[in-house]
Structures are given as structure tokens and as C-alpha cells.
From Swiss-Prot:
Keywords: Endoplasmic reticulum, Membrane, Transmembrane, Transmembrane helix. Residues 33-44, 105-185 are cytoplasmic. It comes from Bos taurus. The keyword Transmembrane applies. It is found in: Membrane; Endoplasmic reticulum membrane. It holds the Pfam family L6_membrane. The record marks 13-14 as: Cleavage. This is Transmembrane 4 L6 family member 20. Polytopic transmembrane protein. Inhibits regulated intramembrane proteolysis (RIP) of CREB3L1, inhibiting its activation and the induction of collagen synthesis. In response to ceramide, which alters TM4SF20 membrane topology, stimulates RIP activation of CREB3L1. Ceramide reverses the direction through which transmembrane helices are translocated into the endoplasmic reticulum membrane during translation of TM4SF20, this mechanism is called 'regulated alternative translocation' (RAT) and regulates the function of the transmembrane protein. Residues 1-11, 66-83, 207-230 are lumenal. Glycosylated at Asn-132 in presence of ceramide which inverts the orientation of TM4SF20 in membranes exposing these residues to the endoplasmic reticulum lumen. Cleaved by signal peptidase at Ser-14 but the peptide does not act as a signal peptide. Cleavage is inhibited by ceramide which inverts the orientation of TM4SF20 in membranes exposing the N-terminus to the cytosol and not to the endoplasmic reticulum lumen. One of its GO terms (cellular component) is endoplasmic reticulum membrane.
Length: 230
């Protein structure tokens, strides 16, 4: 195994781990939503897990490059110019998918879960458009929704239905509401921070494989020439 093939094989194992991690992280809020509500699309944690950044972006789009890179271990297809060049092209798809995962994760961390932004916790309030990925980047990026005691907008204190509520009932309701709110905030933050890191690492591994693939084309030519002389 040449140095190029060795690095390609290492890249393949790294992409495989990141691929599985991305799919798992993306599936966590979907599974929890189904377990809690016994059906999808009702009271989701956020809109962004339904963009499937980990399942499609960091997962499906990384499968071809991962398979090709792992084949280098057995010298099945990455031991020649064509194989290394094809590996570079497939990793370009991985970089695109990882960039998609990265953009969705940044947007998700900027906006927070639905419980912090919407009165109706349903996917009916979600706008699935690629324009949304860049629409709010001009705004300041912060994580106040996560670090504050509560991210839920305060209700109007002049509302008679609230002023007539007893203090004891309000405290019980507030504690119960915050427990659900904190659960959504922690899951949302953990999932998309993890997907953000997965996207960054996949981009780095993908770009490194693109570069090493072009070097592999040169190494493959030299290796073939030496084998013919021997």
C-alpha cells in the first residue's frame, strides 16, 4: 500500500465514523418526537431536523466516497490513477453534503428550538426553503435562547386570565413548562452542535482526500512504471 492509499484508507474509516455519527445525531430528535407524541410532525423540537442535515448531508452524500476510500485498504480500486481521481470526485460530493449539514446546523443554533420562537409547536410553522439558510445570516449570531433562564416570550401581564391565576398554580405551571422547555433546548443545542462539528470534520477530510487523490494520480503513474521495469 502506497502512502496515498494509506491516507485514503484512514480517511475512509474517519468518514465512516462521522457518517454514522451524523445519522445518529439527526435521528435523536426525530425518535424522541415520535416516542413522546406517538406520531411525527406533532410538537417537534425544531424544524431543522426535518431538513435531514445529518441523514442526507453528512450521511447519504458521504457514502460513495466512504466506500471508495475503504476499498483502498484491499487495493481494490484506489491503486491506480483512475481510482484515485474517482475518489477525489466522490469526495467533492461529500464536501457539498457536509457544507449543507454545516449551514443547517448554524441556522438551527442561531434560531433555537420551536418552543423559543413559535406559539404552535408544529411543522406547519416551518418554511422549508434553501433561501432560509442565508436569509438570517445578517443578524447577530448568539445563543441567548440557550444560556438564558427561559427563552419563551413572556405573556402579557395585562391579560386578565393571567392576573387572576393564583401564585401557587402559576409556580406549578411554570416549573412544568420549564422542564419541557429545558429538555427541548438541551437536545436542540447538543444535536446541532454535534452536527456542526461533524460537518466541519467531513469538509476537512473531504478536502484532504481531494488533494491526496490528485497526488495519488502522480504516485500511481510512478508505481506502475517501476513495476513494469522490474
Amino acid at each position: 500500500m502506497t502512502c496515498c492509499e494509506g491516507w485514503t484508507s484512514c480517511n475512509g474509516f474517519s468518514l465512516l465514523v462521522l457518517l454514522l455519527l451524523g445519522v445518529t445525531l439527526n435521528a435523536i430528535p426525530l425518535i424522541l418526537n415520535f416516542v413522546d407524541e406517538d406520531q411525527f410532525f406533532e410538537n417537534p423540537i425544531s424544524c431543522f431536523e426535518w431538513w435531514f442535515p445529518g441523514i442526507i448531508g453528512a450521511g447519504v452524500m458521504a457514502i460513495p466516497a466512504t466506500t471508495m476510500s475503504l476499498a483502498a485498504r484491499k487495493r481494490a480500486c484506489c491503486n491506480n490513477k483512475t481510482g484515485m481521481f474517482l475518489s477525489s470526485l466522490l469526495n467533492a460530493i461529500t464536501v457539498i453534503g457536509a457544507a449543507y449539514c454545516l449551514l443547517v446546523s448554524i441556522q438551527a443554533l442561531a434560531e433555537g428550538p420551536l418552543i423559543c420562537n413559535s406559539q404552535s409547536n408544529t411543522t406547519s410553522s416551518c418554511e422549508f426553503s434553501l433561501k432560509n439558510l442565508t436569509a438570517n445570516y445578517k443578524e447577530s449570531f448568539d445563543l441567548q435562547w440557550f444560556f438564558e433562564d427561559s427563552c419563551v416570550p413572556h405573556t402579557d401581564s395585562n391579560n386578565p386570565s393571567i392576573t387572576n391565576t393564583t401564585a401557587n398554580n402559576w409556580r406549578v405551571y411554570n416549573l412544568h413548562f420549564n422542564s419541557i422547555e429545558n429538555q427541548h433546548r438541551i437536545i436542540h443545542f447538543s444535536v446541532f452542535l454535534g452536527l456542526l462539528l461533524v460537518g466541519i470534520l467531513e469538509i476537512l477530510f473531504g478536502l484532504s482526500q481531494i488533494i491526496i487523490g490528485f497526488f495519488g494520480c502522480l504516485c500511481g503513474g510512478v508505481s506502475n512504471g517501476r513495476s513494469q521495469i522490474v
